[in-house]
C-alpha cells in the first residue's frame, strides 16, 4: 500500500478532535485506501485492533436498505467497554439518515469518527441539521503528480518523461498502479465514469432522457477551461434541434458537481475585489475523464494543463478563481488566507507575443506570479514573473 502523506498528515492533525472527519471525492479516487492507511497508522500508534471498527456500507451490501437506527445499533454492539473507539465508516451515504447515527455516536459514546462518501447524499442538508459545526470536510482528489511518481517507483524514467504519461493517463490510483496502454487505461476510467453517472446521477435523480444528459456532459467536457453558462448550453442544444430548459441544465451541472465529476471555478474581479456570479469555468475531476469520453487529441492539451494546475492548487488548500483584471484574464488567482499567487498556463510561450507575462505584469501588487508551461527552454524570470516548467511547478514546495 502506497502512503498518501498529504491526507495522512491532515487526518493526524484532527485525530481525537471531537469532529466527524468526512473524506469526500469521486469514486475510485482512493478514499477507502486512505481509511486502510489510517487503520494501519492507528495500530502502529498503539491503538488496540478491537477498538478500531471498520465498516463498509456499499449499495451491494445493503441493497435492501439499512436504517440509521440499525447502523447505530450495529456499531454500538461492537463497543464493549468505555475505552475510545475509532470508527472508520466507508461509503456512509448508502445509509439513509447516516448523519443521525453518526451524531448519536459522537454524542453518546467515546468515539473518534471518520467517514467517506462519493456523492451528494453524503453532503445533504441533513448534515446542517445534525452535524452543524461538528464535522470537517476533507476533499480527496485523484493522484497529484508527486503522488503519481511515488506510485511509479522504482520506474527509471525521469519526472518529465513520466509527466507525459500522467498528462495522458490521468491520476486514478488503479491506473497508476498498473502498466496500461492508453486504450486499457481509458477503458478502466470509462468504467469508473459510467458507475458515477449511473449510480450517483441518472438513477438517483431519475433522468429519463439519457441521450440529452450525455450531450450536456459532452458539451462540458469539450469546453473545459472555457467560460460558459447554463444559458449557453441551452442555446447550443437548441441549435442542434434539442430542447432543454436552463433550469434543467442548472440541475445537471449541480448533480455532476455533487458527484465530484466537475468542479466549478468562479471569476474574481481584481479591481472590485469580489467574486463574480457569471461566466464560470468547470474542470474535470481527472484529465482522463475527458479522454475516455472524447479520446485523446493533441489540441486539447492546453485545457488539460489548466485542469491539472487547477487541482494542484486546490490540493494545496487554495481557493481558486479565474482572475478578471479589467479586460484581461488571468488563468488562476489562488488565495489562501492573506496570501495569494497568480498563475498563467500555456503549452509554450508564444515567440511573437508577451500576452501571458504582460497580463501578470499589469497586476500591481507583490504576490508571486507564475507562467507554467511545457516549454523546456522557457524557464527563467521576466520582471519578477517566474517562468516554470509544469513538472517543476507540480513538484515545487515554494507555494
Can you name each region flagged by the protein language model?
Residues 323-324, 347-391:
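Catalytic cores of nucleic-acid endonucleases
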Residues 53-83:
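Short glycine-rich substrate-engagement loop in P-loop NTPases that contacts/grips substrate
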Residues 23:
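Hydrophobic anchor at the beta1->P-loop junction of P-loop NTPases
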Residues 34:
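Hydrophobic positions on the alpha1 helix immediately C-terminal to the Walker A/P-loop
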Residues 118-120, 124-227, 260-263:
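Interdomain motor-coupling "hinge/lid" segment immediately C-terminal to the ATP-binding subdomain
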Residues 2-16:
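Pre-Walker A adenine-sensing motif
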Residues 180-339:
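Accessory nucleic acid-recognition modules appended to NTPase machines
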Residues 31:
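Conserved lysine of the Walker
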Amino acid at each position: 500500500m502506497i502512503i498518501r502523506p498529504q491526507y495522512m498528515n491532515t487526518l493526524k492533525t484532527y485525530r481525537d478532535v471531537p469532529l466527524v472527519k468526512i473524506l469526500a471525492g469521486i469514486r475510485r479516487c482512493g478514499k477507502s485506501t486512505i481509511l486502510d492507511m489510517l487503520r494501519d497508522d492507528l495500530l502502529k500508534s498503539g491503538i488496540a485492533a478491537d477498538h478500531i471498527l471498520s465498516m463498509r456500507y456499499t449499495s451491494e451490501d445493503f441493497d435492501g436498505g439499512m436504517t440509521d437506527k440499525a447502523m447505530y445499533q450495529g456499531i454500538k454492539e461492537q463497543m464493549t467497554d468505555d475505552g475510545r473507539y475509532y470508527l472508520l465508516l466507508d461509503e456512509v451515504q448508502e445509509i439513509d439518515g447516516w448523519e443521525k447515527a453518526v451524531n448519536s455516536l459522537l454524542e453518546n459514546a467515546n468515539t473518534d469518527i471518520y467517514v467517506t462518501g462519493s456523492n451528494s447524499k453524503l453532503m445533504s442538508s441533513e448534515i446542517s441539521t445534525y452535524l452543524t459545526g461538528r464535522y470537517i470536510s476533507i476533499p480527496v482528489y485523484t493522484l497529484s503528480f508527486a503522488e503519481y511518481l511515488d506510485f511509479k517507483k522504482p520506474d527509471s524514467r525521469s519526472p518529465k518523461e513520466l509527466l507525459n504519461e500522467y498528462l495522458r493517463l490521468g491520476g486514478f490510483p488503479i491506473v497508476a498502479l498498473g502498466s496500461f496502454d492508453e486504450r486499457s487505461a481509458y477503458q478502466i476510467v470509462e468504467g469508473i465514469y459510467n458507475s458515477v453517472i449511473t449510480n450517483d446521477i441518472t438513477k438517483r435523480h431519475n433522468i429519463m432522457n439519457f441521450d440529452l444528459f450525455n450531450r450536456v456532459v459532452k458539451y462540458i467536457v469539450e469546453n473545459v477551461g472555457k467560460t460558459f453558462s447554463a444559458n449557453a448550453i441551452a442555446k447550443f442544444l437548441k441549435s442542434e434541434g434539442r430542447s432543454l430548459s436552463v433550469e434543467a441544465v442548472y440541475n445537471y451541472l449541480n448533480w455532476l458537481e455533487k458527484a465530484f465529476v466537475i468542479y466549478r471555478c468562479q471569476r474574481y474581479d481584481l479591481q472590485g475585489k469580489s467574486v463574480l456570479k457569471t461566466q464560470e469555468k468547470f474542470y474535470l475531476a481527472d484529465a482522463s475523464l475527458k479522454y475516455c469520453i472524447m479520446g485523446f487529441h493533441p489540441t486539447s492539451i492546453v485545457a488539460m494543463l489548466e485542469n491539472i494546475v487547477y487541482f494542484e492548487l486546490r490540493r494545496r488548500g487554495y481557493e481558486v478563481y479565474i482572475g478578471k483584471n479589467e479586460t484581461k484574464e488571468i488563468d488562476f488567482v489562488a488565495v489562501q488566507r492573506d496570501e495569494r499567487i497568480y498563475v498563467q498556463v500555456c503549452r509554450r510561450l508564444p515567440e511573437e507575443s508577451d500576452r501571458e507575462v504582460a497580463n501578470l505584469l499589469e497586476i500591481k501588487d507583490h504576490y508571486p506570479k507564475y507562467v507554467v508551461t511545457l516549454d523546456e527552454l522557457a524557464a527563467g524570470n521576466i520582471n519578477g514573473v517566474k517562468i516554470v516548467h509544469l513538472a517543476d511547478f507540480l513538484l515545487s514546495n515554494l507555494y
